[in-house]
């Protein structure tokens, strides 16, 4: 697996990931450059979310390292986790949730500065939810809730976003809206790393693909389409393109 670390924002070296004595990912190495749109795909239970939590420092690898570069600090990564029922019923206002994304900027301060409140409002406007500021989060639709959480993630960074299944449980219309928003953020210069079960969407939007399974593949989207030797990858690509790979 070849990769260039010279201009990388994120470098994962020889990662072995798992829980207790069970290893789920072995010897994974890849690098993400500024401006990349990396989609992480694979079967359920293959370790995609474990990898993302390791990148964020929420889990420790069994071995290997995760490093940042190009001026990216570990606390400058915005994170949109998979939604849970607890999150969906969270009894807070949209404004409170989005503003909480600025907490990493506060340090020991028990209050938000004017600049942080301005940033929160700007990100709400960017996501088209400024008019929902005083609404209770749990009263919103699934698509609106995801926009709120994406605005919150943007308060932490203008450099890199990590998104874990950002369109899961959304209806097709809301999925397309979310993909469009994420693509606009990518075009504005933000590096995107997204877990997705949808290889079709990955091939529409990604610059690079990381497939985790019995075989691991990392490369550009074109390399994934034309050179991947993963049997389960090829089956899904054939469905999309209607031809043998």
Which stretches of residues belong to each language-model region?
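Conserved ABC ATPase "signature" region
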Residues: 114-132
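Conserved ABC transporter NBD signature motif
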Residues: 64-77
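Helix N-cap at the start of a conserved alpha-helix in ABC-type nucleotide-binding domains
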Residues: 172-174
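Conserved ABC ATPase signature
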Residues: 136-140, 144
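H-loop/switch region of ABC-family ATPase nucleotide-binding domains
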Residues: 196-197
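Catalytic Walker B motif of ABC-type/P-loop ATPase nucleotide-binding domains
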Residues: 161-164
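H-loop (His-switch) and adjacent beta-strand-loop-beta switch element
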Residues: 209-222
């Amino acid at each position: 697996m070849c990769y260039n670390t010279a201009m990388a924002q994120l470098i994962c070296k020889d990662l072995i990931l798992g829980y207790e004595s069970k290893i789920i990912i072995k010897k994974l190495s890849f690098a993400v450059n500024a401006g990349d749109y990396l989609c992480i795909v694979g079967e359920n239970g293959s370790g995609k979310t474990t990898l993302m939590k390791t990148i964020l420092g929420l889990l420790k690898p069994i071995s290997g390292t995760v490093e940042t570069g190009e001026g990216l600090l570990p606390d400058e990564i915005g994170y949109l986790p998979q939604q849970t029922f607890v999150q969906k019923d969270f009894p807070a206002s949209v404004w409170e949730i989005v503003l909480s994304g600025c907490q990493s900027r506060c340090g020991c301060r028990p209050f938000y500065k004017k600049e942080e409140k301005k940033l929160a409002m700007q990100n709400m406007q960017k996501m088209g939810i400024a008019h929902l500021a005083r609404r209770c989060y749990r009263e919103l639709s699934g698509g609106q809730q995801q926009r709120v959480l994406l605005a919150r993630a943007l308060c932490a960074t203008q450099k890199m976003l990590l998104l874990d299944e950002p369109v899961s449980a959304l209806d097709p219309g809301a999925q397309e809206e979310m993909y469009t928003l994420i693509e606009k953020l990518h075009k504005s210069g933000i590096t995107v790393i997204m877990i997705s079960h949808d290889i079709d969407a990955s091939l529409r939007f990604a610059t690079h693909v990381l497939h985790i399974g019995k075989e691991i593949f990392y490369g550009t989207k074109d390399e994934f389409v034309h050179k991947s030797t993963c049997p389960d990858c090829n089956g899904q690509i054939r469905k999309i393109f209607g031809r043998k790979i």
